[in-house]
Amino acid sequence: MSAEILDGKSLALKIKEELKKEVQDLKNQGINPCLAVVLVGENKSSQKYVSFKEKTCKELDIQSLVFKLPENTEETSLIKLIDELNENSQVNGILIQLPLPKHLNQNKVLERINPFKDVDGFTPFCLGRLLIDSPLFIPCTPKGIIRMLDEYKINLEGKQAVVIGRSIIVGKPLSLLLLKRNATVTMCHSKTINLQDITKKADILCVAIGREKFITSNMIKKGAVVIDIGINVTASGKVVGDVNFDDVKEKASYITPVPGGVGPMTIAMLMENAIYAAKLQKRVVK
């Protein structure tokens, strides 16, 4: 029997409809949410993600400001722009599209963002708040994954959760959120030995390694919940995940497709964070 599909696309549409009403309520109070997105360089994937974010802002009537900077932008220039956006009271959220060109210090750049405008949740302040179970902004992809698991009433308490990938974007914050739900979490990465022995014990397997169709059915146990966070483009131009979907779906109980799983939820959570930032700064919430 094939796995049930965790339909992130449909859930994201439902969430966006609710957010659209929230935006209208804020506008009725004279509050106009505004998200600033900074893109440095010519990375094609980054350009595509930024266009998705612009499009979704437009759908929800959130103002978006996109700053496209050349590949050779100096760090001082980027920091100066962030400082200006921090000071601009009309801008509620600031997002630096990652990855940055290699000559830029990602940590230094992210640290410069005002934590109360850090809608990606990547500043040391926001990550620290997440660590002590008092989050301000939760990184969008992990937040979307947990929301999806909740929607499908997938219980995490006492379950063995395996996360492959240790970035601050997905792996580390997702592990913290799973721990918060009382899962027993194992984090794996490129140096993990005997990976298959670990993945086969997972009740919940979350994969974010950037390797096309890497996870196969012989690497999971029957009935596992499989969350595919990978986005890879094949030689033919097809978008696929880190999981061999057609193979694994015959053994898993639930699985996310790529596209249409985690990706749409990430964008929806970004919009939710942007709206929350506007409320926070205008003191609609505390």
UniProtKB/Swiss-Prot annotation:
CDD domains associated with the record: NAD_bind_m-THF_DH_Cyclohyd
Any single GO BP term: purine nucleotide biosynthetic process
Enzyme Commission (EC) number: 1.5.1.5, 3.5.4.9
Gene Ontology cellular component terms for the protein in this record: cytosol
A Pfam family it matches: THF_DHG_CYH
Keyword tags: Amino-acid biosynthesis, Histidine biosynthesis, Hydrolase, Methionine biosynthesis, Multifunctional enzyme, NADP, One-carbon metabolism, Oxidoreductase, Purine biosynthesis
SUPFAM superfamilies assigned: Aminoacid dehydrogenase-like, N-terminal domain (SSF53223), NAD(P)-binding Rossmann-fold domains (SSF51735)
Pathway membership: One-carbon metabolism; tetrahydrofolate interconversion
Keyword rRNA-binding attached: no
Catalytic activity, as annotated: (6R)-5,10-methylene-5,6,7,8-tetrahydrofolate + NADP(+) = (6R)-5,10-methenyltetrahydrofolate + NADPH; (6R)-5,10-methenyltetrahydrofolate + H2O = (6R)-10-formyltetrahydrofolate + H(+)
Protein function: Catalyzes the oxidation of 5,10-methylenetetrahydrofolate to 5,10-methenyltetrahydrofolate and then the hydrolysis of 5,10-methenyltetrahydrofolate to 10-formyltetrahydrofolate.
NCBIfam families given in the database record: PRK10792.1 (NF008058), PRK14186.1 (NF010783)
Family assignment from sequence similarity: Belongs to the tetrahydrofolate dehydrogenase/cyclohydrolase family.
Record text on subunit structure and interactions: Homodimer.
The name this protein goes by in its record: Bifunctional protein FolD
Taxonomy of the source species: Bacteria, Pseudomonadati, Nitrospirota, Thermodesulfovibrionia, Thermodesulfovibrionales
